[in-house]
Amino acid sequence: MAPKKDVKKPAAAAAPAPAPAPAPAPAPAKPKEPAIDLKSIKIEFSKEQQDDFKEAFLLFDRTGDAKITLSQVGDIVRALGQNPTNAEINKILGNPSKEEMNAKKITFEEFLPMLQAAANNKDQGTFEDFVEGLRVFDKEGNGTVMGAELRHVLATLGEKMTEEEVEELMKGQEDSNGCINYEAFVKHIMSV
């Protein structure tokens, strides 16, 4: 049998190249949530509570002028038992710039409606919410999570923490196997 000849097929007519796709439109900027009108907030704290809050407020005063910077508001609100996210604090503050956060100062009278706004927020997680969130990482089902995994989660998911913040939070929490009892950890966090 004779070898087959390699018959070349005529090249198909080249189709014109499609026009390049237009660049995708930039994603619309997420609108900032409107700031909370602090003047409309009714203070519901007792006189005794307000005195305690003022005492705590003054502990954060670094210059002796009875004022704090906006960057300290979240720390004081949390020290007084509330648990707002940084985004919630920014909304309460009116979404200030980084420069304003470090430069602008407020008095206790300006701070009190901010604290009340945080206290009025009902979306704060409970002990059970936090434990349930950590239970997902409990591979053994024994009430513990790996410290390294928890560090990674805290630094990369949700409202990300810096390495320094993570280390400060986890100080003294790991056992000799590098595991953390997450119920005790949540109690620790909620008491800080």
UniProtKB/Swiss-Prot annotation:
Repeat as UniProt keyword: yes
One cellular component term from this protein's GO annotations in UniProt: contractile muscle fiber
Single annotated GO MF: calcium ion binding
PTM description: The N-terminus is blocked. N,N,N-trimethylalanine, found in other myosin light chains would not have been detected in the N-terminal tryptic peptide in PubMed:6709041 and PubMed:7238855 because it would remain trimethylated and ninhydrin negative after hydrolysis.
Keyword Repeat set for record: yes
Transmembrane segments: none
Classification via SUPFAM superfamilies: EF-hand
Residues where N,N,N-trimethylalanine is found: 2
Region of interest called Disordered, as start-end residue ranges on this chain: 1-34
Superkingdom of origin organism: Eukaryota
EF-hand domain sequence ranges: 48-83, 86-121, 125-160, 160-192
Protein name: Myosin light chain 1, skeletal muscle isoform
